Amino acid sequence: RFQRLTGGYRTFCRLTLAQARGVPGPRLLELGAGLGRLALYLTDRHPTARVTVSDIDPDVVERIRRGPVGSHPRVTPAVLDATSIDAPDDAFDVAVLTMTLHHLPTPGVVALLEEGTRVARRLLIIDGWRHPAYLAVAPLLWTTGGLPHLHDGLISLRRLYGAKALHALAGACAPTVAVRTRFAPPGY
């Protein structure tokens, strides 16, 4: 609910499709997709995009398969580990991970960067903005999900990777991964 209320999915979709600009029939990989709502935004806004929507949890992927995302003709649900992706090199034009990076430990981030850039021409990571002003969203977290959502949100805010950390982790990749960071309203 939080991403729908704040326009997050629209922002994620816009940023993802910008990475696929000029590619006819782009092959998109959504990593750590949860319920895969971004896949519906992507297929609604790009008439030829094909999306593999994935999560590490088989139960989550089964829920995707049984729902509106899984029944879409241009969406393929898959159980995938974002740190060890079972796909050939350059299988996708864009791989995208949204609001999940902060859940990975440091070695997992390095593995994600290596794997994401191996299987896709571009890897787009969208996560929260590490800044004290981000605490202003606490009331919205409470409103959209109650105490559990507020608790998870505040912990997530503390675990966000900053730009310096991402550049350092990209330098630890083999081969080194080029990283560009920027702020994208409403707070990513």
Placement of each model-derived feature along the sequence:
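Class I SAM-dependent methyltransferase Rossmann-like catalytic core
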Residues: 1-11
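Glycine-rich helix-loop-beta junction characteristic of Rossmann-like nucleotide cofactor-binding loops
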Residues: 16-23
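Class I SAM-dependent methyltransferase SAM/SAH-binding core
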Residues: 29, 35-84
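A conserved beta-strand element that flanks and buttresses the S-adenosyl-L-methionine
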Residues: 96
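Hydrophobic adenine-recognition pocket in adenosine-nucleotide-binding enzymes
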Residues: 100
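A short, conserved alpha-helix within the catalytic core of class I
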Residues: 104-115
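Conserved beta-strand signature within the Rossmann-like core of class I S-adenosyl-L-methionine
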Residues: 120-128
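C-terminal alpha-helical "lid/dimerization" subdomain adjacent to the S-adenosyl-L-methionine
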Residues: 128-174, 179-181
